[in-house]
Amino acid sequence: MDAPVLYAELNLAETRGLRCTSAPSLPQDACQGPGWHRVALKLGCAGLIFLLMVLSVLVGFLVQKPLIEKCSVAVQENRTEPTGRSATLECPRDWHPHCDKCLFTSQTSRPWADGLVDCNLKGATLLLIQDEEELRLLQNFSKGKGQQFYIGLKYEEVDKVWKWMNGSILNTNLLQITGKDEENSCALISQTEVFSDSCSSDNHWICQKTLKHV
């Protein structure tokens, strides 16, 4: 009677031994784990890059939105005549609407004085920048054109200051002029900065005039 019991115990021990020896086969699946981890990591990185791109676009839009709304308000105010009636505001042909202004960009490059004369002949003046928000919009405008332009700002050697064509002195809190402050220096606007150059240099220019009621 003792023999069968012994056999059963040995059989059970062998079965347990087999189960124990089969356990080392499990790490084969585990060895595949790092591959899946790498794939997941790559997908995660790609998703993060995409989210950052979307975020940058949204930030750019949110920055520009107040500026665009400000222009819309300015235009809407000018659309209302003294009588309270709505009026149509239009720019002349070949001029670009910008807030409450019309802008003209020259097709040729000439010295600053020639640009000033050209604007005067068109019943306009070289561009005047009123505030920092308008500066950013005009830099985007310049970026779209892919050029740099003379504006209505010139260095006055006698007074040692930069002056706009309307006689007002440049507010350095509004913008900083990159380059030299010296006689015969005129300001240009590009997509990134406002800088000085010799007034005798050939450059494009921007004229401005107010929107007209028609």
Swiss-Prot record:
Positions in the Cytoplasmic compartment: 1-42
Keywords per UniProt: Disulfide bond, Lectin, Membrane, Signal-anchor, Transmembrane, Transmembrane helix
Domain C-type lectin intervals: 98-208
Listed InterPro entries: C-type_lectin-like, C-type_lectin-like/link_sf, CTDL_fold, KLR_subfamily_B, NKR-like_CTLD
CDD domains: CLECT_NK_receptors_like (cd03593)
Segments on the Extracellular face: 64-214
Recorded GO CC terms: membrane
Gene (name only): Klrb1
GO MF annotations in UniProt: carbohydrate binding; signaling receptor activity
UniProt-annotated location(s): Membrane
Residue intervals passing through the bilayer: 43-63
Tree of life domain: Eukaryota
Species annotation: Mus musculus (Mouse)
Name of the protein this chain belongs to: Killer cell lectin-like receptor subfamily B member 1
PROSITE patterns the record matches: C_TYPE_LECTIN_2
Gene3D superfamilies reported in the protein's UniProt record: Mannose-Binding Protein A, subunit A
Disulphide-bonded residues: C119-C207, C186-C199
Membrane topology type: Single-pass type II membrane protein
